[in-house]
Design a protein with these regions (language model features):
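Rossmann-like flavin
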Residues: 112-223
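N-terminal mitochondrial targeting presequences
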Residues: 1-12
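Short beta-strand to alpha-helix junction loop
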Residues: 179-193, 234-254, 264-266
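Residues forming anionic-ligand binding surfaces in small-molecule and nucleic-acid pockets
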Residues: 222-233
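A conserved short coil-to-beta-strand element within the FAD-binding core of flavoproteins
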Residues: 265-279
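N-terminal glycine-rich phosphate/pyrophosphate-binding loop and immediately adjacent elements
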Residues: 12-158
Length: 334
């Protein structure tokens, strides 16, 4: 299982550090929870008038006391144990702040066929039932689906230590646990290529590769590493948070505020202040606010160009190099 070795509560460090966090999206709020649990003074600055970042929501009031809420970003939730670990580390329980429902079926796929009605697949964590639906499309696909799940269980298990720590230098990539991943990553193959190892029917491949679009990528271009995405759905399920995914942001914000975190919405950070190469605070509405440390939870390229002076960046992070890069879009779905 990719769960971490421990979910014990973070012990207060006794530190009197003062930390600014740029952005009240899920990463910023998670950072705030963990830092506050260790005893650090935390202030979160969010440019928008509401929390959530790309997991914010739109509210349409229809009459007094009644309104409709629409998630602006994700609409379903994966791997809830990760958020459970964050809450546990802060000495709290996710179930005290949010209500999650496991979906079964997870979603319905309509697989189009020229001149025919689409094939309907109701995806489920019941591997035998899911395999039977795939067998109806391609003989033997059920057994291959079970092999696909087993292989990706090994892949994610080996990759988890790597995914849970920063890669700061080349030697991090040749550490023992990183090298254990090398034989199973197949970096020269795409998600679509790797599915060809298991299935022949293009509709079965579509059913298990469209998840790469969550990353804004085509299955034909997406690195084969990301076959873990459909595996994660079938292994851990798809969940609906009552109130939408933004309700999870509210849950995290509530936990933060209980621990003394200050969350300032409508407070766009214009730039980070520096003394030499050390961040010393943030500039908001023309005011420089001192902090000992700054955590940035914003798009990396945007933050580099807008928050950090070019003179302090590495050459590969110059404005010209950042402008020359290709960036994937997110997925727009109705």
């Amino acid at each position: 299982t990719p769960r971490s070795a421990t979910t014990t509560r973070i012990a207060p460090s006794g530190s009197k550090s003062d930390v600014a966090i740029v952005g009240a999206g899920p990463g910023g709020l998670a950072s705030a929870m963990l830092l506050a649990a260790s005893g650090v003074k935390v202030t979160v600055y969010e440019a928008a008038p509401v929390i959530g970042g790309r997991t914010s929501r739109i509210t349409l009031e229809v009459e007094r006391g009644r309104a409709f809420h629409f998630d602006r970003g994700p609409t379903f939730f994966l791997m809830p144990y990760v958020l459970e670990e964050i809450f546990a580390a802060a000495g709290k329980r996710l179930q005290d702040y949010a209500d999650l429902t496991r979906l079964d079926p997870m979603y319905r796929l309509l697989l189009g066929r020229p001149g025919k009605d689409p094939l309907v697949v109701d995806t489920t964590q019941d591997i035998e039932r899911m395999g039977a639906q795939l067998d109806a499309i391609e003989r033997g696909a059920g057994a291959q689906f079970r092999k696909f799940i087993a292989d990706n269980r090994v892949k994610l298990d080996r990759m988890t230590p790597l995914l849970r720590r920063p890669i700061r230098k080349f030697t991090d990539l040749i550490a023992k646990d990183a090298m254990k991943c090398a034989p199973i990553l197949a970096p020269h193959k795409s998600v679509h290529d790797l599915l060809g190892k298991y299935f022949d029917d293009p509709l079965v491949k579509i059913a298990l590769t469209f998840q790469s679009k969550y990353l804004g990528m085509s299955p034909m271009e997406c690195p084969s590493l990301f076959t873990i995405l459909p595996f994660i759905e079938y292994e851990y399920g798809i969940w609906h948070p009552r109130g939408g995914c933004n309700a999870l942001m509210r849950a995290m914000a509530d936990a933060c505020e209980e621990m003394g975190v200050t969350i300032r919405t409508g407070a766009p950070v214009e730039r980070i202040s520096f003394a030499g190469q050390r961040a010393t605070g943030v500039v908001v509405d023309g005011e420089t606010i001192a902090h000992e440390h700054v955590v940035v939870n914003a798009d990396a390229a945007w933050a580099m160009k807008n928050l950090i002076p070019e003179s302090l960046r590495r050459s590969q992070d110059s404005d010209a190099n950042l402008d020359a890069k290709r960036y994937s879009c997110s997925t727009y779905m109705l």
